[in-house]
C-alpha cells in the first residue's frame, strides 16, 4: 500500500492550485473525476467569470491565461434586473469571461509530473486509522487503496470529505440550473436577476462564444419549475431564448452564518467550496478557492504543532470577508432595500441611446 504526505480529493481551482504549489515539496496524490482532456465526462456548470480577486491570485503566482481559456466577448458591466419592481440598472464590473471547463483543465495541466494525478477517477471511501488517512478510489478500471498523513477535501459543494468530518453539519443548498441557447441578442450582455417570488438567491445570464447562458440558484425541491417560470417572465425585459442547446445543473452552497465555514480536523482540511468558501452575494468561488489553497500550502509547509488550529486561524481574514458577503446578500435580496438602492441611481451607468 503506497503512502503519501498529502492526498487531495478534487482538482477544481482549489485542488489544482494546492497540488501545483506543493509539488516537489511534499509527496502528493490527487484524484479528480474530470477527464484530462476534451469535453467528455464531468464539467462544472458555471457562468464562467473570473473576478478581480482571482485575477490578483494569478498575478501573485506569475500566471497568465492562455487564449483558449478566454471566451468572447469581454463585458464591462452587469445589467441588474429587479423583476418585481421592473427596474434595470447597469453597474461596472471587471470580470474576465472564460470557458470554465477549459479553465479547469488548464489549471490541472499546470500540476507538475511529481504529483501523482488520477483523472476520471472516483473516490469510494475514506477513513482514519492508526494516525493515517485511508483512501479507496477507482481509476484506470481498478480499485486502489492508499494512505496519507494529510487529507484535503477540495471536492466542492457535495464534498465527501466534509460529510465524513462533519456528518451533522447543515448548510443551505440550492440547485443551480443553466441552459445554453444560440445568441440572438444584438448586443451581448451579462445580467444579475432578482425575483423574490422565484428564489431568495439570484439568477444570471452571460453571453459566451456565440451562446446565451441563462441560469440561477433555486430551492432544491422545485427548482426546475421556478427556473421555467422565470424564463417566461424575462421576455418583458427583452431576453431572447429559443430552443435550449444544452441544460446543466449542480448543487451550490449558500453560506448564511459564521458556522457554515468549516476548515477540517484530525489532519484533514477543507478548501474552496468544500469549506463553504463561496460568496453568498454572487456565488463566486474561484477567488476563494485560490486563496484558501495558498493559505493551506503555507500551513502545510510550515508544519506547526497544532496544524488544524493553524489553518483555522490563518483563514480568519478570508472567513470575515465571506461573512461580509453574507451581510451584503441579505441587503441585495431584501426587496425594499434593493429597490431603494436601484432607484437612487447610485453607481448606475446609463446607456446612451441613438
UniProtKB/Swiss-Prot annotation:
Gene3D superfamilies assigned: FAD/NAD(P)-binding domain
Chain segments annotated as transmembrane: none
Entry superkingdom: Bacteria
Coiled coil: none
Molecular function in Gene Ontology: FAD binding
Family that this chain belongs to: Belongs to the CbrA family.
UniProt protein name: Protein CbrA
Gene this chain is encoded by: cbrA
